[in-house]
Amino acid sequence: MKTKIIVIVGPTAVGKTALSIEVAKAFNGQIISGDSQQVYRGLNIGTAKIRPEEQEGISHYLLDVRDVGESYSAYDFVTEATQAIREIEAQGQLPIICGGTGLYIQSLLEGYHLGGSVPHEEILAYRAQLDSWSDEDLFGKIAELGIEIPQINRRRAMRALEIAHLGGQLENNLPDYEALLICLDDKREKLYERINQRVDLMIEDGLLEEARWLFDKAPTSQASKGIGYKELFPYFAGQVSLEEAVDKLKQNTRRFAKRQLTWFRNRMSVTFYQVGNPDYKNQVMEDIKNFLDK
């Protein structure tokens, strides 16, 4: 029997973390972070990492598991999240994945992962190329390569071509998990307003000092390429004013939120919940209960 898991995704600043705590408390769960930046020790403010006092006694996995000079990939995430799910299940508790890194979460849920040597950026670039192909082009390439796919559709065809092109291995044809995918959303103007406010609060909370530490310690690392840090590096180098850097950070975060929503909408079978709906949490809880009772 497949392991049932809850997955909470959505754009940055929409309220995923707070909801994950409520779900964990209501359904005896533990939380696995699905965020590519929160794995890094020392990057707390810019990644909006949940603080220990906010965890309310709920165990969290895949936070602070790498130093900032180290790399982290979808391969690493799938390997470590799989182990975390096993540990949580062995304790008789519910695994809850919460985060906004669609590539990582999708790789876990679809039952395969690409080889650990494939850079994140290369995967994204090839996926963008496949996105531009018509169904006819995709299925034609599948036939040309002699790839056999049960119940072929566009999504499966794209996965198979990614694996063939990037040299990964299909570990499972079917996923190991039965997942309920919850995607939080909000009206654009509300979400963007929260993003701008969050950035201002991050600056007040010490983001400049945190980013400066990263700039001095590992300026060319994978960690330094994350939104929240790279925008401030030109300020440290004396190339732009602080106001310009912060404006760029807000702009990049808004654009990132838009890309996240596009990913979840087009690549994952999620159910959307509007956080502006005063009853949305009750609906989430009811849907989780029904899912677990099946």
UniProtKB/Swiss-Prot annotation:
Reaction catalysed by this enzyme: adenosine(37) in tRNA + dimethylallyl diphosphate = N(6)-dimethylallyladenosine(37) in tRNA + diphosphate
HAMAP family referenced in this protein's UniProt entry, alphabetically: IPP_trans (MF_00185)
Span list, region Interaction with substrate tRNA: 35-38
Upper lineage: Bacteria, Bacillati, Bacillota, Bacilli, Lactobacillales
Residues holding ATP: 10-17
Pfam families per the UniProt record, alphabetical: IPPT (PF01715)
E.C. designation(s): 2.5.1.75
InterPro entries per record: Dimethylallyltransferase (IPR039657), IPT (IPR018022), P-loop_NTPase (IPR027417)
Function: Catalyzes the transfer of a dimethylallyl group onto the adenine at position 37 in tRNAs that read codons beginning with uridine, leading to the formation of N6-(dimethylallyl)adenosine (i(6)A).
Family: Belongs to the IPP transferase family.
Site residues, Interaction with substrate tRNA: 101, 127
Name listed for the protein in its UniProt record: tRNA dimethylallyltransferase
Subunit structure: Monomer.
Uppermost EC category: transferase
Keywords, sorted A to Z: ATP-binding, Magnesium, Nucleotide-binding, Transferase, tRNA processing
GO molecular function, one term: ATP binding
Cofactor dependence: Mg(2+)
Organism for this UniProt entry: Streptococcus gordonii (strain Challis / ATCC 35105 / BCRC 15272 / CH1 / DL1 / V288)
Annotated GO biological process: tRNA modification
Residue sites binding substrate per the record: 12-17
